[in-house]
Amino acid sequence: MYAVIKTGGKQYRVQIGNKLKVETLPVEVGSDIQLDQVLMVADGEIVSTGAPLLDQAKVSATVISHGRHDKIRIFKMRRRKHYRKQQGHRQNYTEIQITGISA
């Protein structure tokens, strides 16, 4: 059984036991959360899709940790003009583990 959920402006395909890093959620480490923006649930041959969301479906998860991704470098340059600009960015994330899918 798997589901497609939407959180933080992105869509994720999840199964029970999966760990994934999503955009920062304002919750404590170790707490349980309910993700109710479920787009699709598949159980074997039975596939349920929403338009765009499924009303009764929920995905439950446990917050494992909060952290920051690796730094990415942004480098802008204009040729022949001696214009060079370098910038770094680290995005915050929340790591969750999927504990249940209810349709």
Curated annotation (Swiss-Prot):
Record GO biological process: translation
Keywords for this protein: Ribonucleoprotein, Ribosomal protein, RNA-binding, rRNA-binding
Annotated Pfam families: Ribosomal_L21p (PF00829)
One Gene Ontology term of the molecular function aspect: structural constituent of ribosome
GO CC annotation: cytoplasm; ribonucleoprotein complex; ribosome
Superkingdom as given in the UniProt entry: Bacteria
Keyword field contains Flavoprotein: no
Function: This protein binds to 23S rRNA in the presence of protein L20.
PANTHER family attached to this UniProt entry: 50S RIBOSOMAL PROTEIN L21, LARGE RIBOSOMAL SUBUNIT PROTEIN BL21M
Protein name: Large ribosomal subunit protein bL21
